[in-house]
Each structure stands twice: as C-alpha cells, then as structure tokens.
Amino acid sequence: MGSNYLKLTFDKLDVGEINELVAHESCGAVALFVGTTRDNFDGKEVVLLQYEAYEAMALKSMNHICEELRGRWTDLVHIGIHHRLGTVPVKEASVVIAISSPHREAALEAVRWAIDELKKSVPVWKKEQYAEGQGCSEWKENKECTWSKAYKDNHIL
C-alpha cells in the first residue's frame, strides 16, 4: 500500500512538492487538481479568500477520503491532499490533490471523486473578501457540504 500525504497549512501550496511526494516509479500517471482563488463571484470582485478549519476533524476526514479512494480504486499508489488555511489571494492555490497510479484512468477518476468528497465532508470554511464598496466580506456555505442547508434541502436524509 502507498502513502497518504495530508497537510493543512498557512503557507503557500507548492504543486511541485506534492507532485514529487506522490510520484512513484511503478506509476504511469500522476493526476493533479489545483483549486485556486478566482477574482469574482456573483458579480462581485473577490480580492482574497480566508479559510478556517476544525483542523483535527479536517485531517481525520481527509484520511477517510484516502481510505475510500483506496477501496474504490485499488491500484492507487500515493495520495496527497494539501489544503491552505488563512489568507489565499486571487490566483493562488487553496487546495491541491495529487494521486499516482499505474494508469491514468484510475488517477483521473480518483482525483475528481476526491475533490467532490472533500467539498462534501471536510470541515473547512471560507470567507470571501470583496473589493471596497461591494459588501466587504461574506462567509460562504459550500452547497455540497453534507451539513449545509442547501444540501439538506436537495437530499432526502
């Protein structure tokens, strides 16, 4: 079995670092997802995001995602999930997921599933900071998150 590289950090995320961590000589693929701060939302100019987490639970949830990934795609080798906390300016990465596998199909499918699951289950919250005169800032509820009102309104529990 491969390794899981999980990290919550206030430092800038390094895509090269996580790629190097998950690369393996038996693998023909490393699939990466890099989530970045975009400069707009709902017609408002976003200048940065502010992330907070319940860190112990977030790491536990990230580890559970890795266990689920390995159950669904048995040939995955290494998995890396790094999430930034604190201030994340526009264009910078807030989350990086990297997965190595002997074949690209499994790695690509697993990365897509992992980001969707991360958004659903990991207790990380973001606040959007808007340009001056556009409402200052707003905490955002992730509609995919299983404890959110939007999720509960659209799913039978």
Swiss-Prot record:
| Reactions catalysed, as given in the entry | 2 [molybdopterin-synthase sulfur-carrier protein]-C-terminal-Gly-aminoethanethioate + cyclic pyranopterin phosphate + H2O = molybdopterin + 2 [molybdopterin-synthase sulfur-carrier protein]-C-terminal Gly-Gly + 2 H(+)
Q: Is Transferase one of the keywords UniProt gives this record?
A: yes
Q: What pathway does the UniProt record associate with this protein?
A: Cofactor biosynthesis; molybdopterin biosynthesis
In its UniProt record, a GO molecular function of this protein is:
molybdopterin synthase activity
Q: Where in the cell is it found?
A: Cytoplasm
Q: Does the keyword Secreted apply?
A: no
Stated EC number for the protein is 2.8.1.12
Q: Which GO terms describe its biological process?
A: Mo-molybdopterin cofactor biosynthetic process
Pfam families per UniProt: MoaE
Q: Which SUPFAM superfamilies match?
A: Molybdopterin synthase subunit MoaE
Any one Gene Ontology cellular component term annotated for this protein = molybdopterin synthase complex
Keyword annotations of the record: Cytoplasm, Molybdenum cofactor biosynthesis, Transferase
Main subcellular localisation: cytoplasm
Q: Which residues bind substrate?
A: H103, R104, K119, K126, K127, E128
- Origin: domain of life: Eukaryota
Give the similarity note.
Answer: Belongs to the MoaE family. MOCS2B subfamily.
General function of this protein: Catalytic subunit of the molybdopterin synthase complex, a complex that catalyzes the conversion of precursor Z into molybdopterin. Acts by mediating the incorporation of 2 sulfur atoms from thiocarboxylated MOCS2A into precursor Z to generate a dithiolene group.
Miscellaneous remark of the record: This protein is produced by a bicistronic gene which also produces the large subunit (MOCS2A).
Q: What is this protein called?
A: Molybdopterin synthase catalytic subunit
Report the gene name: Mocs2
